[in-house]
Amino acid sequence: MSSPISIVFCGTPEFAVPSLAALCADNRFSVDLVISQPDKPVGRSQELTPSPVKIFAKEQGIEVWQPESLNKEFAAHHFAKRPDFLVVVAYGQIVSQQVLDFPIVAPVNVHASLLPALRGASPLQHAVLLGHAQSGVTIQKMVRELDAGPILGQSSIELDSRETTASLHDKLSTLGAQLLIDTLSHPLHPIDQDNGKATFCHKLTRDDGVINFQTMTAVEIDRKVRALVPWPGVKWNDIKILATDVAPQANSIAISCVHDTQLFITSLQPDGRKPMSGTDFERGYPEMLGKMKGGL
C-alpha cells in the first residue's frame, strides 16, 4: 500500500477551513503541518484570537506554526521532511521563491475566481461588485507573480441575482475543497494562463464603501451593499447602509438615484445607534431622510 500524499497547509480564515477539512477526511492525504497567521486581537477587549484554520487544525491534533513572516523565518524552521504538496488557501502573506520550491511535487493555491479573471486580494467581493453572472474557483500551481501560475483545475457556478459576498464565500469555499481533492488525486496537467485576459482586484478599504446617490445608479449601490457588507461596509455620510434592493420591499425607504433609478433601503444604522428598518429610520430621523433624498 502506497504512503499517503504529504501536505503542508497554509491558510488562515474561514474560507480555508473546508479545504483543510477535506484533506484531513481523505486517507489518501496526510496533513503534516498547518501554517497560519499569528493570533490577532479582536473586538473591544482586543483579546488575542486564533484563526479559524488554527482552531480546526488543533481540533484535529495537527501541529500549527504561526510565523510573523513566513519568508523570513522559513529557513530557520525545522521541518521533519519536504512535503509532496504545499497547499495555500487564503493564507494572507506573499510567499517567497524559497517557500515555493520547498514541496517535492508543487505548491498549489485555491483561488476564488476563474483565473485569469480577478487576480488579487478580493475576488469574491469583486464578482458581486461587478455584477458577474458566473464565478468559480481555480487550483493553480503557484509562481512568484501573484495569481499568474498555470491552471491545474477549474470549476464554475452561476451567480444568483441577489448573490452576496457571504453567500458566494460559502459556495466557493465548498467548491474549492472539492476541486482541490480532485486535482491532487490525479496527475497534474498545468495549462498556462492567458495573461492578455487577466483582470485584477485590489485589497479593499473603507473608501470603497462610500456611496453617492447623485452619481451612482441604484444597481451600482445595491451591488456595493451586497458585496461590501459587513466589510469594509457601505456608508452614506455617517450612516451605514446594511441591506438594499432594486425592487420595492416591505419596511423600506425609496431613494432616487441617477438615470431615474430607485434604491430601496431595508436596513441601515445611524452613527452610534442600533440597526433599524427603513420605515423606523423614516419615523425617527425625518430630517436626515430629507437630506438623504435631497443629496445633501
Model-derived features: positions:
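Hydrophobic beta-strand scaffold residues
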Residues: 31, 63-64, 107, 135
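Glycine-rich, highly charged phosphate/nucleotide-binding loops
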Residues: 63-74
